[in-house]
Amino acid sequence: MRQACLRRPVVETLAMTYRSSALKRRVCPSSKTPDSRATLQSSITERILRELEHGVVPWVRPWGSGTATSVGIPRNGASGRAYSGINILLLWNAAAWNGFGGHNWLTFRQALELGGHVRRGENGTTAVYADTFVLEAEKLRAAQSGEEPHRIGFLKRFTLFHVDQCEGLPDTAFTKPMHLEEAMIAPRVKALLSASGADIRITGDQAYYAVNGDFIVVPPVQMFHDPNNWPRTALHELSHWSGAKHRLNRDLSGKFGSELYAREELVAELSAAFVCAELGIVPTVRHADYIGAWMGLLRKDERAIIKAASLASKAANFLMDFDRQGTPRPDPQDAEQTLASGALTPITPILVPAARAA
């Protein structure tokens, strides 16, 4: 039996950028849409589908354009809490469309509580959160049977404003993510990978996660034209690794070309983008050849992108815990020496040489 694995050729794909022609066709996010649950899900999916159809990948933020500052995850400007799931894509999308700098957002009330206000005429951006309810008939059934009632999940909308849309806010509302020098990125990723304890094998010319063997294969850094594509690729495969049954327990049984395979690839793609943004690495499209499959998936299931983004956030948080758990930060001088020496490999633990999975 062929060893089950999630694998792909290492193809250096160019990052999808926000082209001016695509921007002209994009629809600016707005909170003024009908308030049914079905409409909310479908409007989010339709927006992302339009992005993909126009060659714009929503999780590839144009970090180097216009007023964009540094790479980062959207956060609440009052609490500092990071937004998650589909809200990351919605807020990245709105920031790109409106040319906002930074990553901090507030509700209308939070802006007032901080001593400021939203400027007159500004339009908010729709964000969502999950809630549940119980049907009256289900409440009655549960009461009669003594069982817990079955709760139905749904999305509820709320409106956020970027701090650039506000006036009179304290400086704390404009906090920016710590900028990570490029020389620090590779050592930090290396430390995260090492802390994860993943079995990472540096060999061959393909990158994949072998499900049955629970190991990752990544080619040597020298095989990448852009050295930053090595950590991007490693984090993508580590995202697959996070879904193993004894970790986050996602269904990794999909065969290449199947819908289940496309779903998992979308989760890993989003998870890697979220982790890259947290680590100061500009996300890129690692799987441009899967975009067609993702569009088909979203057309078939309007909940697919929301579910994938939710699973991706869980995976990203799982991986970022290895970065947060006291992982030492390398000295900048040491980091430069690490890059200069090409010491992205080996990464421990390593088992080499490794046979290529069939």
Protein language model regions, located:
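N-terminal accessory/interface modules of nucleic-acid-binding and processing proteins
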Residues: 2-358
